[in-house]
Amino acid sequence: MKNLFLIIGAPGSGKTTDASLIAQHDEKFAHFSTGDLLRAEVASGSELGKLIDGFISKGNLVPLDVVVNAIVSAIKSSNKSNIIIDGYPRSVEQMTELDKVLSEQDEISLKGVIEVDVSEDVARARVLGRARGADDNNEVFNNRMKVYLDPIKPIRKFYSEKELLHVVNGERGIDEIVADIKNLLAKLI
């Protein structure tokens, strides 16, 4: 049985860094982003990978059901028993599809959804302060924040009703945040 943990949060919340640090320092955990999972599936040469490559190579979005199947495939083929995926789900549709697929199999159990909570001001300061790419500007940040905020209430409600949602204060030092998430993961396994 694989234990699945989802880490969600606003752009700049630190969710990817948090998940990466946990996986680097605890060999029981693997960390994936959705993009990593899709690229790994393509690299595997599987039929699913060929299907994904057909969309990506033409610059098209990969259909939702294909993305979720890639996530499930990567989780099942991982040599780790605890999987952290950050930044997923990003929409009610993604959440619903993942829930449907997970309910149809018995090899993966969703153990928790961790929201790294930061204010919009903190998120903005972090994203604009890091300026990792050309897309790290105020206009793009506002759009990314809207994409995050629009579905977050129904996503929180859905996972709260399943008693899976755990909120961590992301406005502290990285060591404190990671320690809190590690403690939470240990309780949920």
Curated annotation (Swiss-Prot):
Keywords: ATP-binding, Cytoplasm, Kinase, Nucleotide biosynthesis, Nucleotide-binding, Transferase. It holds the Pfam family ADK. Pathway: Purine metabolism; AMP biosynthesis via salvage pathway; AMP from ADP: step 1/1. Residues 33-62 are annotated as: NMP. It catalyses: AMP + ATP = 2 ADP. AMP binds at residues 34, 39, 60-62, 87-90, 94, 132, 144. The keyword Kinase applies. PROSITE patterns: ADENYLATE_KINASE (PS00113). CDD domains: ADK (cd01428). SUPFAM superfamilies: P-loop containing nucleoside triphosphate hydrolases. It is found in: Cytoplasm. ATP binds at residues 12-17, 130, 172. One of its GO terms (biological process) is AMP salvage. Its EC number is 2.7.4.3. One of its GO terms (cellular component) is cytoplasm. Residues 129-135 are annotated as: LID. Monomer. Consists of three domains, a large central CORE domain and two small peripheral domains, NMPbind and LID, which undergo movements during catalysis. The LID domain closes over the site of phosphoryl transfer upon ATP binding. Assembling and dissambling the active center during each catalytic cycle provides an effective means to prevent ATP hydrolysis. Catalyzes the reversible transfer of the terminal phosphate group between ATP and AMP. Plays an important role in cellular energy homeostasis and in adenine nucleotide metabolism. This is Adenylate kinase. The gene is adk.
